[in-house]
Structures are given as C-alpha cells and as structure tokens.
C-alpha cells in the first residue's frame, strides 16, 4: 500500500487521498495548509514569512481568480457551468448577495462575468490545435507526491499522452515569455513533471484583450530553472520550520 505523509505528519493511503482531492474543499482547504504546491513554493521563493502570510491572510486579486475559474470551467469542463448560478447586475446587488448566501460565492457569478468568460473560452475552443489537445484528454487531474521529503500537491488542467497542459490567461500574449519567468511558471512545470511522471509540459495561453491564442512548449533550460527554484523553495520551507517565531523572520545578506 503506497502512502503519503503530509506536512502535519498525517499519513494517507495514496489511492484514498487522490480520491479526496477531487473535492475542492479538501484540495484547497485541508491540503492548502498540509501540502505544498506550486503557488506555495512561489511564496517561499519570496520568503518563509511571505509563505506564512499566505496561510493566514485572505487572498487578494479575487476577481482575477474568479475570472480564471470560470474560463477554466468553460474550456475544460463546460458541463459543470450548468450547476453555477448567474445573476443580473453587479456583485453589490441584492440578487447576487442572496444567491451567495444560498450556494456560496464560488458558485455565483454575474452575467457580466459570464459573458466575458464565454467570449474568451469560445475563442480558445474554436482553435483547431486546441481542439486536438482537448480531444481524448483528461481534465483537472490531481496528483500528490513527495519532493525533497515534503508533500506536494498539484492538479493538471489537461493530461494527455504523458503531457501536462496548463491553461493560462494573459493581458499581453507578446510578453508571455517574460510573464512566465516573472510568475515562476517554470517552477510549476518542473513540479508537475515530477508529480505526474510526465515527459513534457505545455501552456495554452489566451490574451484576454485581443483573444490571441498561443501554445508554448517548455525547453530543458526552462525546466532546469524551475527545478532550481523548487529546490530553493524547499530549503526555505525548512527555514520556516526552524524559525521559532515567524513574526521575527528577517532576510539577511551582505551587499
């Protein structure tokens, strides 16, 4: 029986936890604290204190996350859109607030949000190369494993023939290469190759303004850069564990 030990030292049967990871509340809630991820690693690259804050403070830029959630559903799992609630007006409207009380904010979107996401997702799904990627693929597949003796989780947007494909939106597709480095997408690619035992990683990218669509493969140099960042992130996590009072953590160096 293959098992996985989480950051809180709880041990799960690998098969059982993968089944639980299909539930978003378990995946983002419980495992958000008790397993590392690409997003957690990016915080650790900033500092152990930045990682600590990410565990204890509410997320910012919530609208971008909402837009991304809806676009992902419409492109990858359009059948699930039928289970969402859409309302007239803004998120300040009485109708929206009542709907949130009934089914939760993650299940309620305004018609304006719907129309924006629909326009983008229809463009993505209309591209022949993207259609070929989606045909016969599996979507939103979870994985969990250890890296440098630490539990890591991940969820592949698209998994097909040993290739992990991630759907990204961007404000400027011409600058995606720069964005990929800035947002450490190389770290995500390196981690997911490890988690899924995949041999390649690609990005399907859509420009939210121009609706241009791009498909970007990852070079060996890109993956190697991600591995270096991943190793730094795990070192920072061990620093986090060894810091008696994280509020006193300081970054030290000599100029």
Language model regions located:
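Metal-dependent nuclease catalytic cores that hydrolyze phosphodiester bonds in DNA/RNA
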Residues: 1-153, 250-255
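Metal-dependent nuclease catalytic regions and adjoining charged, substrate-binding loops involved
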Residues: 2, 181, 191-255
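Short histidine-centered catalytic/ligand-binding loop motif
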Residues: 58-60, 105-109, 174-183, 219-221
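Short amphipathic alpha-helical face segments that pack within enzyme cores
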Residues: 70, 187-194
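Secondary-structure boundary elements
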Residues: 129-133, 161-163, 194-200
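Histidine- and/or cysteine-centered catalytic micro-motif in compact active-site loops
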Residues: 142-144, 163, 168-170, 206-208
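Short, glycine/acidic-rich beta->alpha junctions
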Residues: 150, 183-187
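Conserved catalytic cores of phosphodiester-cleaving nucleases, focusing on short active-site segments
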Residues: 154-176, 192
